[in-house]
């Protein structure tokens, strides 16, 4: 197709949304002429499913709960006045608490203002807040954000080393809906130890975001933490960024959360419309369906040409893959659905994996994200009449063209500028696109049985570790190979896991296990040194 024909196709397939400063171009997706007509009936069903969801239908049958993240930016949509009042009350509480921290009404025990915050959470309790913090942060942040988003001791040590003595004026926000997430519990305990090592009371620095009457909630009440904010059972972790999970850290950082919510609300309003070609979330979902044949046949590559959107692909990775990656459909059929999502940022990626995208296996489609405003204020010229931002724009357009010339499909999202309102709109756009796509392929986007299976398996490993270490410490003076150890505790079938447990325990002095080298690693012998 020559460039003039592509221009006409671009004009025909550009979705423009002035209210949120966002355009979606689907012209470089090679869907057939009859595509929209053929799938319209299924798309209308997806609109109906979404309307039922927003109306309070039990969407997550596993847990018998509603799915109501859309109510967070439009409380009047909540199915009861009580829920609407709770949402409004919580938002007001977040704003008042943040204002108190900023004006010095709420201070650190030293009497000084809090200047930093440590957010402890994992999955949706970290990825959303991290994305927003990185996308909208600046040198003028009221509280500088740090994160414990894993149960990696070295990772937590690095964060604490960076905070250093400023821990005295650091607020810690612990986020866990159930209050029982082990990674978050571990991060909280590591943080508590760090405060105590400096002679500080953790409770005087701590805030909880959790479900009512959860173990974390009870701990916060018992210890007298600074504040508690709710996580409702009808908000899933990966769609919680416009709840207290994301709004509290953002407000404390100094981000305009009213603008964030307004962008999400306006995008919800647009993407609630039933005219498919005018609905950018519906178009996204349909392009995913076209590109992947509705069964995950191709990967989704996210290429934002903006440093501030670096973490967007990680955020979308969870939102999309945890929602869409399902073994069974709603009828119980094994379908193994999913779309793999990865990405980084342009033009960095042009010096990394774009080579394969253009000339390697064609197993993907690209979503480019273009931000028209380069920076606040005027840019210098790096060449006559050319700025650094002009180069970035040129690289984006060149990559898009080069990929399409070689039969690689792409979508392009264009936003006027990157601010809180735009970020809210992008979050809402993808949340709804995920819901529509799930309806198109007949799956439940709002549960995650695979995650629970992994947690249970981890528990089995830790129980086995307890048996292994207990036996070794009782058998003073004796040495065991992994196979001998497995036989001794009656876990012969778990010998590989026993071997991995022994390797890890012997590398960490706190466990009191030493190892002696053998002819091969499988001949290594392990003993207690306590």
Swiss-Prot record:
- Taxonomically, which superkingdom? Bacteria
> Where mainly found?
cytoplasm
Keywords, in A-Z order: Cytoplasm, Gluconeogenesis, Glycolysis, Isomerase
The EC code for this enzyme is: 5.3.1.9
InterPro entries assigned to the protein according to its UniProt record, in alphabetical order? G6P_Isomerase, Phosphoglucose_isomerase_CS, SIS_dom_sf, SIS_PGI_1, SIS_PGI_2
Q: From the UniProt record, list the reaction(s) this protein catalyses.
A: alpha-D-glucose 6-phosphate = beta-D-fructose 6-phosphate
Cite the active-site annotation.
Answer: 322 (proton donor), 351, 455
GO CC terms: cytosol
Keyword Isomerase among UniProt keywords: yes
Its GO biological process terms? gluconeogenesis; glucose 6-phosphate metabolic process; glycolytic process
Q: In which pathway does it act?
A: Carbohydrate biosynthesis; gluconeogenesis; Carbohydrate degradation; glycolysis; D-glyceraldehyde 3-phosphate and glycerone phosphate from D-glucose: step 2/4
Q: Does the keyword Cytoplasm apply?
A: yes
One example GO MF annotation = glucose-6-phosphate isomerase activity
Spell out the subcellular localization from the entry: Cytoplasm
Question: Gene3D superfamilies in the record, alphabetically?
Answer: Glucose-6-phosphate isomerase like protein, domain 1
- Role noted for this protein: Catalyzes the reversible isomerization of glucose-6-phosphate to fructose-6-phosphate.
Family membership noted in the UniProt record: Belongs to the GPI family.
Protein name, UniProt field: Glucose-6-phosphate isomerase
Q: Tell me the organism.
A: Geotalea uraniireducens (strain Rf4)
Q: Which gene encodes it?
A: pgi
């Amino acid at each position: 197709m020559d460039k003039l024909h592509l221009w006409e196709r671009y004009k025909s397939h550009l979705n423009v949304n002035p209210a949120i400063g966002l355009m979606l171009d689907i012209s470089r997706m090679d869907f057939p002429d009859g595509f929209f007509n053929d799938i319209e009936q299924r798309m209308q069903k997806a609109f109906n499913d979404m309307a039922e969801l927003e109306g309070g239908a039990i969407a997550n049958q596993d847990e018998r709960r509603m799915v109501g993240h859309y109510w967070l930016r439009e409380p009047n949509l909540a199915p009861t006045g009580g829920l609407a009042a709770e949402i409004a009350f919580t938002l007001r509480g977040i704003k008042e608490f943040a204002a108190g921290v900023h004006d010095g009404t709420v201070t650190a025990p030293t009497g000084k203002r809090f200047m930093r915050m440590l957010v402890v959470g994992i999955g949706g309790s970290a990825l959303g807040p991290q994305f927003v913090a990185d996308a909208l942060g600046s040198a003028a942040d009221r509280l500088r954000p740090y994160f414990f988003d894993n149960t990696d001791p070295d990772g937590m040590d690095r964060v604490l080393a960076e905070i250093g003595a400023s821990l005295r004026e650091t607020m810690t926000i612990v986020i866990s809906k159930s209050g029982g997430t082990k990674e978050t519990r571990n991060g909280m305990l590591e943080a508590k130890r760090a405060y105590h090592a400096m002679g500080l009371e953790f409770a005087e620095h701590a805030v909880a975001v959790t479900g009512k009457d959860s173990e974390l909630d009870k701990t916060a009440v018992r210890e007298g933490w600074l504040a508690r904010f709710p996580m409702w059972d009808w908000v899933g972790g990966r769609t919680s960024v416009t709840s207290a999970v994301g709004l509290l850290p953002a407000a404390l950082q100094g981000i305009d959360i009213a603008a964030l919510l307004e962008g999400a609300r306006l995008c919800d309003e647009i993407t609630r419309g039933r005219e498919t070609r005018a609905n950018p979330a519906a178009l996204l979902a349909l392009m995913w369906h076209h590109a992947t044949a509705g069964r995950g046949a191709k990967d989704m590559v996210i290429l934002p040409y903006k440093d501030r959107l670096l973490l967007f692909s990680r955020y979308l990775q969870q939102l999309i893959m945890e929602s869409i990656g399902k073994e069974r459909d709603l009828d119980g059929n094994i379908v193994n659905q999913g779309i793999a999502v990865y990405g980084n940022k342009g033009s960095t990626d042009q010096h990394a994996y774009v080579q394969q995208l253009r000339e390697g296996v064609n197993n993907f489609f690209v979503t480019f994200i273009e931000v028209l405003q380069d920076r606040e204020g005027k840019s210098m010229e790096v060449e006559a009449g050319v700025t650094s931002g002009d180069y970035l724009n040129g690289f984006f357009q060149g990559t898009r063209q080069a990929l399409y010339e070689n039969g690689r499909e792409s979508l392009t999202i264009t936003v006027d500028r990157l601010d809180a309102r735009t970020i809210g709109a992008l979050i809402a756009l993808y949340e709804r696109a995920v819901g529509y796509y799930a309806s198109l392929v007949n799956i439940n986007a709002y549960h995650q049985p695979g995650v629970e299976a992994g947690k249970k398996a981890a528990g089995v490993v830790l129980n086995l570790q307890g048996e292994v270490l207990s036996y070794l410490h009782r058998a003073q003076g004796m040495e065991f190979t992994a196979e001998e150890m497995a036989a001794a505790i009656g876990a012969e079938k778990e010998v590989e896991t026993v071997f991995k447990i022994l390797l890890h325990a012997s590398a960490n002095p706190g466990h009191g296990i030493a190892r002696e080298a053998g002819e091969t690693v499988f001949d290594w012998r392990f003993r207690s040194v306590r």
